[in-house]
Each structure stands twice: as C-alpha cells, then as structure tokens.
Amino acid sequence: MSLWYIIVAFVFFSTIIIVRNTRKTKKNLPPGPPRLPIIGNLHQLGSKPHSSMFKLSEKYGPLMALRFGSVSTVVASTPETVKEVLKTFDAECCSRPYMTYPARLTYNLKDIGFCPYTKYWREVRKMTVVELYTAKRVQSFQHTRKEEVASLVDFITQAASLEKPVNLNTKLMKLSGSVICRVVFGINLKGSKLENLYEEVIQGTMEVVGSFAAADYFPIIGRIIDRITGLHSKCEKIFKAMDAFFDQSIKHHLEDESIKDDIIDLLLKMERGEIELGEFQLTRDNTKGILFNILNAGIDTSAQVMTWVMTYLISNPRVMKKAQAEVREVIKNKDDIIEEDIERLEYLKMVVKETFRVLPLVPLLIPREASKDVKIGGYDIPKKTWIHVNIWAIHRNPNVWKDPEAFIPERFMDNQIDYKGLNFEFLPFGSGRRMCPGIGMGMALVHLTLINLLYRFDWKLPEGMEVEDVDLEESYGLVCPKKVPLQLIPVLTQWS
C-alpha cells in the first residue's frame, strides 16, 4: 500500500511540474535567434554588442529575446518599444540586475547607477536631484569651469606656437577630471600626490565595468573564468586604489577648513544627519558608492563627448567652418566667454546633438531588470528578465532618421528634439526614473570648452593625414571612447 501512495504522489507532483512548464511554454515571448547550448547567444555579440544587436533586431524585430548563459534577456531597439520600457512600464522595468563587479566597486550597490529599485534608491536619487545637481549648484561652480578651461587654452596656445599636435583625448580627460575633483572634493589635482592615483582609478574602473564578466552569466564557473582571465584580480586592485583615493580625498577635505560648499561637504553633512535623507542616514560606504557614480559618469562622459565632437568636426570641414563662423560672429572680440553664450549658438548645439545621435556615448543603457511579469509590445516579459535598451539602434534606424550614417547637424533645425528624455527617437542620456541626473553639470563644461576651442583656434590634421584618414571607430565599453586617439594641430588666429 505504501508503494501505491508513493506512485500516486510521484504522478501528482510530476503532473504539477508538467502543467507549470506547459504554462511557461505558452507564454508569448519575443522572437529571437536560435541559441547554442550553455552559452545561448553570447557568440553572436561580437566586439560591438550594440551593433550586433541592431543587425539581429533587423531580422527578429524591435523587441528581441536573447539568452546570455543562464540569463534571459530582451532587447528593445525602436522608439515605440523603448517608450514602453522607459515610460509606460518604467516602474516595472527600472530595477537593476545584480552585476558582480559593479556591485564590488559600488560598495555592495550603495550607489545610484547600479543599485536596484528600492526605497533607499528612491531617497538617494531624490537627494541627488534636490541637493547635488540643481541649476543653482551647477551655476555655483561656473568659476571653477572657467579657470580649468582657461588653463587648457593656455596649454593649447603654447602647442600652437610650436606647431605641435595635441592629444585631445588626454587633454580633455584631464580637463574633465580636474573640474570634477575640484567640484566634488575641493582638490586641485595638478601636481598633487593624488593625481597619479586618480588617473589609475578612473581608467581602471571604466575598464572593469565595461568588461565581459562571466560571473554574471554562469553561476559558480563564471567566477573561476574571471579569475583565469584576470578580471577578478583587476577589480580588487582597482577597488583598493579607489578606496584609498576616496579616503585620502575625504581626509584632505576634513583637514583643510578653507574647503567648503563642494559636493563631498554635502555628503558628509548627510552622514552626520545635518541634512535629512528620509528614514536613511548615509554611512561612509554610501558616500563612497555615490562618489563612484559622480566621478566615473562625470569625468569620462564629458571628456568623450568633447573628443567625439572635435572628431566629427575635423572630419567634416563644411560643418567645422560653419560652426566656427557662428561662434566667432556671436562672441566677436569678447574676452570673457561665459556659459550662457551657448544659448545664442544654435548651430553648435545642433553639432553636439548630431554627435550624440551618430555615436551615443552609452550605446546600450545599463541593463534593467523586470521586477514583475509585464507585457511589452504584445509580448510576455517574465519577472527577472534583463532588459537592454539599444540607443545606438534607435539613432541609426533609417525609419527614424534619414541618411542615418551621415553627419548632418542641420537635421535638428526647426524642431524641438532635445536630449532631456522626452523624445524617444533621441535618447543619449536615457529617460524615465533612471535618466542621468547630472546632464546640466556635464553639458555646462562641454559647451564652454567647445566654444573656446572653436573660437580661439583653427585646427588641422597632422602632416600627411587627409580628412578621409580620420578614424571614426569606437572601442566598446560602458562608455565608447575613440579607438584611435585624436591628434590635432592647433593654429593661432586673431582670436587666440
């Protein structure tokens, strides 16, 4: 009799499992390419996943299902599907999946960018908008930006007098880093003991975050793979360097009573409870996690934007000539260039927008995770599915943009398309709850720098190079830098 009960129980539970699996298979999942055992579709990503995903979406549709190892993923590639993800179902799709190395670098997700959608995240995000990135605060650091840009202009003037090429990748990265470190810590990095440590941290963290992490897709064995490839040890090394940089910078801030009203000052006040953060009080690890976001997002993105704008200008002489003519007409012989001048430079603003369109700096937004079952584009998206938003695909879609491969700033003439997340055909900074909160701070530096570079100097390619030789290829990462550094020769003019 006991055997009979065992058989009945076995049949009963087997039936339940079969019914559940049948229900799962009846879900209307998005279409996608065939998968290989174990690795799924990883072999189809190539060296530039944003480009590979775009090509796959042309065959399988605007919402496409992929599998990366053990991770189920969907990719949204058109304004319509992306609008559903970032607006219609933003609350259901704005959490983050756990990613091993970003978690380590953000002190176990005590940041804003990689933290899942929780009450803590909502409070910290609100704090950044209300306290850190207000228009008033951005304006308060205008003098710092002007000083650092003036220093860059002095360097370029010397290079021009010697007819020496300038590595704009390097100089614009240093400019961005100097501004951010003064704004955040009140520290002038030039010649300080922290300068070399800072450069190691910025370069290393972006490399780690932008690397393929096997641990995210293959439980257990993935960690072994990352140890073999060296990613694990590299992350640990960078984390220790970053932690030391934060500790020394905070110590310097606390010891120098003349430093005040910078961003770290605000965060330390929150640690002490002098500024309320809902029911939370920041710990030192919370502060460091937030600093990780501010430094990496603020420094790398601004520098890369400026580099790419200059790249596309030098490779399009017509556009360069038109942009410089506008800047010189508006500024005329005014010595004091101010950030507000950008409001009268309509063509330069179009050039910046077109650069964002041709090469969005974050071509694949940081993955989102569905916090519950949701239906997008008529398809079922199960809970815990990773959601990739392919901004690069939207910006290169011929159904959205005429001649998408061409660099034509005039396409933004006489329209209201902007990068503030309301136009789903143009989303360089994302949209919705996860939209970049520091746009104002970053773009203030970008505009001021470009105005100075175009007003004060003419630019030419190194000897032996033609316009056709300018390399327009990007390297892949969380942010896409130029694969080949941009070397240009500045030429002194009457405005220098």
Curated annotation (Swiss-Prot):
One of its GO terms (cellular component) is membrane. Heme binds at residue 436. GO terms for molecular function: heme binding; iron ion binding; monooxygenase activity; oxidoreductase activity, acting on paired donors, with incorporation or reduction of molecular oxygen. It is a single-pass membrane protein. SUPFAM superfamilies: Cytochrome P450 (SSF48264). It is found in: Membrane. InterPro entries: Cyt_P450, Cyt_P450_CS, Cyt_P450_E_grp-I, Cyt_P450_sf. Its main location: membrane. Gene3D superfamilies: Cytochrome P450. Belongs to the cytochrome P450 family. This is Cytochrome P450 71B11. It comes from Arabidopsis thaliana (Mouse-ear cress). The gene is CYP71B11.
